[in-house]
């Protein structure tokens, strides 16, 4: 597998709808000229933004976190330009961008250093071949203080790995009817 460059990312987004909406350059300021956490195409990746839709984890029901029987009541829904994550807690969000991953591509998501240096970790599982949807993002606040996430700004970087022509997967995410195929909005755990 080889990592793909900005040229390839632009081509795939424009000609094949791999990322929408798509920013071909790197945006570092908002429309008023204020500096923001950058998003858009980078040398070997694409920096995604999170939407204004957040689910903030709380333990108001003193429940046990169980991925097989997740209690949706453990979240508070927030729609805002800013999300405040409680100390040692987490929040879910989703990308503004909708992805359509080709069969011969695997996408790895890494957090942006701006957030990591503040103790805010972004976790996303790989975007598998032929998966499509909005990416659900998980932000962990590892600090003992509240932490802030900004909507409509960069939060994570996607790296695109392309398989060699003779090594394309036999079974894609779509082939096996993956449970998160076509997800929109912030998607909670499914079993």
From Swiss-Prot:
DCTP binds at residues 112-117, 136-138, 157, 173, 183. Gene3D superfamilies: 2.70.40.10. It holds the Pfam family DCD. Pathway: Pyrimidine metabolism; dUMP biosynthesis; dUMP from dCTP (dUTP route): step 1/2. It catalyses: dCTP + H2O + H(+) = dUTP + NH4(+). InterPro entries: dCTP_deaminase, dUTPase-like_sf, dUTPase_trimeric. Homotrimer. Belongs to the dCTP deaminase family. Catalyzes the deamination of dCTP to dUTP. This is dCTP deaminase. It comes from Xylella fastidiosa (strain M12). The gene is dcd.
């Amino acid at each position: 597998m080889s990592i793909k460059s900005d040229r390839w990312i632009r081509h795939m987004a424009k000609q094949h709808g791999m990322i929408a909406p798509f920013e071909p350059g790197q945006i570092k300021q908002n429309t008023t000229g204020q500096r923001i956490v950058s998003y858009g195409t980078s040398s070997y990746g694409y920096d995604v933004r999170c939407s204004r839709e957040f689910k903030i984890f709380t333990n108001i029901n003193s429940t046990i976190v169980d991925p097989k029987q997740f209690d949706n009541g453990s979240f508070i829904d927030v729609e805002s330009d800013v999300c405040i994550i409680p100390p040692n807690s987490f929040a879910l969000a989703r990308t503004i961008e909708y992805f359509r991953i080709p069969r011969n591509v695997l996408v790895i998501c890494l957090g942006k250093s701006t957030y990591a240096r503040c103790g805010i970790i972004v976790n996303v599982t790989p975007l598998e071949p032929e998966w499509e949807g909005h990416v659900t993002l998980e932000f962990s606040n590892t600090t003992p203080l509240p932490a802030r996430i900004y909507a409509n700004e960069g939060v994570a970087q996607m790296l695109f790995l392309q398989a060699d022509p003779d090594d394309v997967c036999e079974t894609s995410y779509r082939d096996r009817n993956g449970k998160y195929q076509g997800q929109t909005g912030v998607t909670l755990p499914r079993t």
